[in-house]
């Protein structure tokens, strides 16, 4: 009888899922796949806007050729497919719909999060 009551209790009162915190773009590094299809939004870790100006970007990105060298925030290696990526991000054209913005830099030492 006790196991029946416990089963009913667990069936109607499922465990709460942990609350997700805000997206932290400063912790993203490694291989990244940039998705452009809005229909795949639910499969993406977050949304990103590619900022044309360095001054307004949240994160400066340096493209690494090898995934092994992309070991710090701001160092990204482009993944050939979403299945091989550590992070999949949806690229949006509207800045207000993005979780954060990025700008590509050509200098490796400039890569990373901006500090205010």
Model-derived regions, located:
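Bacterial N-terminal signal peptides
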Residues: 3-12
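Hydrophobic membrane-targeting alpha-helices
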Residues: 13-17
């Amino acid at each position: 009888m006790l196991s029946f009551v416990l089963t009913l209790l667990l069936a109607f009162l499922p465990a709460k899922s942990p609350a997700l915190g805000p997206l932290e773009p400063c912790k993203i590094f490694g291989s990244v796949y940039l998705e452009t299809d809005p229909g795949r939004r639910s499969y993406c870790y977050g949304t990103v806007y590619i900022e044309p100006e360095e001054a307004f970007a949240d994160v400066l990105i340096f493209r690494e050729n090898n995934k092994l060298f992309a070991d710090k925030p701001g160092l990204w290696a482009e993944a050939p497919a979403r299945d091989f990526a550590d992070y999949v991000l949806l690229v949006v054209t509207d800045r207000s719909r993005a979780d954060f913005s990025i700008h590509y830099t050509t200098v490796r030492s400039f890569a990373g999060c901006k500090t205010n």
